[in-house]
Curated annotation (Swiss-Prot):
Species this chain originates from: Borrelia garinii subsp. bavariensis (strain ATCC BAA-2496 / DSM 23469 / PBi) (Borreliella bavariensis)
Catalytic activity: (R)-4'-phosphopantetheine + ATP + H(+) = 3'-dephospho-CoA + diphosphate
Pathway: Cofactor biosynthesis; coenzyme A biosynthesis; CoA from (R)-pantothenate: step 4/5
Official protein name in the record: Phosphopantetheine adenylyltransferase
Highest taxon listed in the record's lineage: Bacteria
Amino acid sequence: MKVAVFPGSFDPITWGHIDLIKRSLAIFDKVVVLVAKNKSKKYLLSDVERFSLAKDVISSLNFLNVFVDRYSGFIVDYALINSIKFIVRGIRAFNDFDIEFERYLVNNKLNFKIDTIFLPSSAEHLYVRSDFVKELMMKKDVDLSHFVPELVFNRLKSKFIDK
């Protein structure tokens, strides 16, 4: 069975993430969506909220063979512990590739048996970023349906707007 881990902060999970998960399923038998913690990032949602939201979204979409987990160490260590041989990374633009390629080189030094698969974003999701969702959430009456599922919007709205 070919298994891949798709790590990210998912702060929050977006249609861009979901598209990459769906496309990963065309390549792999099982995909683990790994809600990761990067100590150098400032998050809008807590670790528990990001994990819970990702899990609820994946469940609502009825994906078979997609599982959600969380981890705060090196992704390559998670893959090794769980006998996963592939890491999937999404690429929106050239600057994403530079960052992800450097990450691949570090991971390769840590464990050369785990490979990274780069998936370019679909054209319709090139502009979809969690950062934009966070910024747009502060505007009232903005349509975020192109960025996030309704479940995500409602959860964010109840936390930040309906206070």
